[in-house]
């Protein structure tokens, strides 16, 4: 029951109308019995500073930050965690004792959640795409002690930046998607992670396509785990294609839930909610 004493947590981004975070976070808050609600607030670039400064002064207990503000919000935080600095992105804020914003990033822990029990130590991985999501994925794979990561992208400069930032921690190579070596890498890979938006259910994207086209995947075999960060549609065309090849598949819903659980713990000073509470709420919604 919402009352005059109810506090709130908010998602800040543009757009936010598609977000599933209010569904899963409100299920978790209800489970905990907290007098808190989770809402989504659309916010344009030029309004970000005004909105965040205003939220300090009212009953806001924390924020999620999404596109396009994950980098811009750095300038509005007085404290930034080491992982957020490494990833160059913040997705979670809370007010510290001085009533200033403290920022972190929960995407790495979200990403590795479904991989923790798969023993990927010293294994080889391919990461498709070189944008912001790829940074979280690469850091997660480093944390899981893989031996080699190959980043495949259409963007040479962003691949070079990833190698500069992460290449001292793991054997990391970058290739354009047209490189002839790609087929051998796919054949050898223990894990392929798609961080591109190809296959996502939006007005801009055709859903029944594979990242980099059908021929790119011809050497995929059944020993490879295929992890698509996209969670809508479920399963994606890539995951259906991979399952037909005999591959183990993982969709992005587990990452979404796991990073959300970490954000909730950050806001509530360590309170924990069972994974299935958020996961079931999303599955019932979808």
Swiss-Prot record:
One of its GO terms (molecular function) is NADP binding. Disulfide bonds: none annotated. One of its GO terms (cellular component) is cytosol. Pfam families: SDH_C, Shikimate_DH, Shikimate_dh_N. The keyword Signal does not apply. It catalyses: shikimate + NADP(+) = 3-dehydroshikimate + NADPH + H(+). Signal peptide: none annotated. Pathway: Metabolic intermediate biosynthesis; chorismate biosynthesis; chorismate from D-erythrose 4-phosphate and phosphoenolpyruvate: step 4/7. Shikimate binds at residues 19-21, 66, 91, 107, 231. The active site is at residue 70. GO terms for biological process: amino acid biosynthetic process; aromatic amino acid family biosynthetic process; chorismate biosynthetic process; shikimate metabolic process. Keywords: Amino-acid biosynthesis, Aromatic amino acid biosynthesis, NADP, Oxidoreductase. Its EC number is 1.1.1.25. It comes from the Bacteria. NADP(+) binds at residues 129-133, 229, 252. PANTHER family: BIFUNCTIONAL 3-DEHYDROQUINATE DEHYDRATASE_SHIKIMATE DEHYDROGENASE, CHLOROPLASTIC, SHIKIMATE DEHYDROGENASE. NCBIfam families: aroE, PRK00258.2-2. Homodimer. Involved in the biosynthesis of the chorismate, which leads to the biosynthesis of aromatic amino acids. Catalyzes the reversible NADPH linked reduction of 3-dehydroshikimate (DHSA) to yield shikimate (SA). Belongs to the shikimate dehydrogenase family. This is Shikimate dehydrogenase (NADP(+)). It comes from Prochlorococcus marinus (strain MIT 9215). The gene is aroE.
